[in-house]
């Protein structure tokens, strides 16, 4: 990592440099002296983003006494917890850090997902408190380290004086030998109730929240053991299977048709395909539905009002559209045809992304569960 001033010098002599993500969404303005966020940074949905668990190292007060950290790749076993108790008593530890390593990518099918791992270590913390009443037990969501940093380095940054690395693979007899909370998460991940393939097509204005809800739905489904969950983001798919298409009516319909066809193939292979394009025209949405004939298919309209979408606009697209510098922009210079055949309508300005995702999941369970 380099200081912002060094990065600024490397990039050039401009007074301000705009930092964008991989989708070209502006994140921050960088000068030689400061970094200014363009808009409040978006966060994910789920326990991995809980402020109580995802804490900065500066928020964990160091104690002037031995501190043990457990690096948890998987839900902790009874043997691991007993070892922590024994070692804490041996060295008179005053704090135990339960560090759940959280990756940006989902765990493989059949394995405990980030939310499940965090539920397991939170429950383990309560169990340890009963055995070590004078020891402070702190569960943490620790992002997987980048570069040369190791998980042990991160644990020591949180104040650990001794680091224990948990198992990276389950024993053959799992979940035998695990506490109830860990057993529940292992069995949840191995659940095969979601046996059918399905397609969920979100539609809505830019900035309506459909991509955030789609991502939350994918996380919820994986957390319940669903196999082959695939999130097909509208912007990302436009850069791949729809590269070269414009934004006129015919091109937009072709884009949605291709997206629907790709989603249907994934569903026929047993996966749950979640797509989140704008899909402004009834014709394009009908083509996507037609591609999924014979499959469970949900059309979810995210009906967030236009004025709210404009307020949320991180890319500044609505401003450019109203200024006339972007043509054929849905909601401004190109129409959005409100679907009359949506299976579910959600105003994302009235509910949280998590609540919206739960609503979609419950309907999908009735349709394809």
Q: Where are the language model's segments positioned?
A:
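P-loop (Walker A) phosphate-binding loop of NTP-binding proteins
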Residues: 205
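Hydrophobic anchor at the beta1->P-loop junction of P-loop NTPases
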Residues: 202
């Amino acid at each position: 990592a380099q200081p912002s001033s060094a990065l600024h010098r490397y990039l050039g002599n401009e007074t301000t440099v705009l930092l964008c993500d991989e989708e070209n969404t502006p994140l921050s303005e960088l000068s030689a002296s400061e970094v200014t966020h363009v808009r409040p940074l978006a966060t994910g949905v789920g326990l991995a983003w809980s402020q109580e668990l995802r804490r900065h190292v500066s928020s964990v007060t160091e104690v002037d006494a031995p501190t043990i950290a457990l690096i948890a790749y998987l839900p902790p076993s009874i043997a691991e917890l007993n070892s922590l108790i024994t070692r804490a008593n041996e060295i008179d530890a005053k704090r135990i850090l339960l560090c759940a390593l959280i990756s940006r990518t989902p765990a493989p099918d059949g394995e405990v997902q980030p939310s499940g791992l965090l539920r397991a270590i939170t429950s383990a913390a309560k169990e340890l408190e009963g055995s070590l009443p004078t020891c402070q037990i702190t569960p943490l969501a620790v992002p997987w380290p980048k570069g040369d940093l190791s998980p042990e380095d991160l644990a020591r940054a949180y104040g650990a004086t001794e680091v224990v690395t948990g198992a990276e693979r389950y024993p053959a007899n799992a979940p035998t030998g695990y506490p109830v909370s860990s057993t529940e998460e292992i069995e949840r991940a191995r659940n095969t109730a979601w046996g059918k393939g399905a397609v969920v097509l979100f539609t809505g204005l830019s900035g309506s929240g459909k991509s955030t809800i789609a991502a939350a739905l994918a996380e919820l489904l994986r957390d319940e053991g669903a196999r082959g969950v695939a999130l097909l983001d509208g912007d990302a798919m436009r850069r791949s299977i729809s590269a070269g298409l414009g934004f006129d009516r015919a091109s937009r319909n072709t884009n949605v048709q291709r997206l629907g066809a790709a989603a249907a193939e994934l569903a026929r292979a047993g996966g749950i395909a979640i797509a989140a394009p704008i899909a402004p025209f009834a014709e394009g949405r009908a083509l996507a539905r037609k591609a999924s004939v014979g499959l469970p298919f949900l059309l979810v309209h995210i009906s967030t009002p236009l004025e709210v979408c404009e307020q949320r606009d991180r890319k500044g697209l609505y401003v450019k559209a109203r200024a006339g510098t972007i043509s054929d922009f849905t909601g401004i210079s190109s129409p959005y045809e409100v679907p009359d055949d949506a299976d579910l309508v959600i105003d994302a300005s009235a509910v949280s992304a998590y609540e919206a995702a739960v609503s979609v999941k419950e309907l999908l369970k009735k349709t394809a569960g």
